[in-house]
Amino acid sequence: MGRDEMLRRSLVALAAAVVVTGVVTASVRKAAATYGFGILAIAGVLLPDWEFFDRDYSQWLTPMPASRRTAAEAAADREHDVWKFKPYPLRMAMLTTIYGFGLYKWWMYVSS
């Protein structure tokens, strides 16, 4: 399953979650908040350039070297290995904090 298929499935699951949230809470605002949070969550996981972030975190603010692979080679490689995500401790702490806070705020809004 490539990135496109994963994105499609994520968006369909998000649409189902938005419909369920809207029906259960009878609130268009809460359904829209669910949609917004879901889009940001999906974008945060599926869209980043993992080749850029797979470097040491101290190198994130410097440009990538010019000797990168061609776009065709990178696309072919991504099709075979969708999850190039390496669980570095700093990255995991950052993502857990951001997504945890976002999920908490979303839940407090939807459950109110």
Swiss-Prot record:
Coiled coil regions in record: none
TM ranges: 33-53, 92-112
GO biological process annotation, one example: anther wall tapetum development
Localization: Endoplasmic reticulum membrane
Keyword Endoplasmic reticulum: yes
Cystine connections: none
Record GO cellular component, one term: endoplasmic reticulum membrane
Membrane topology category: Multi-pass membrane protein
One of the Pfam families matching this protein, by short name: SPC12
Disruption of the gene: reported phenotype: Male sterility due to abnormal formation of the tapetum and development of pollen mother cells arrested at the early stages of meiotic prophase I.
Signal peptide per UniProt: 1-25
Record key words, sorted: Endoplasmic reticulum, Membrane, Signal, Transmembrane, Transmembrane helix
Role: Functions in tapetum development during early meiosis. May play a role in the endoplasmic reticulum (ER) membrane in the early stages of tapetum development in anthers. Seems to function after MSP1 and before UDT1.
PANTHER family on file: SIGNAL PEPTIDASE COMPLEX-LIKE PROTEIN DTM1
Family from the record: Belongs to the SPCS1 family.
Protein name: Signal peptidase complex-like protein DTM1
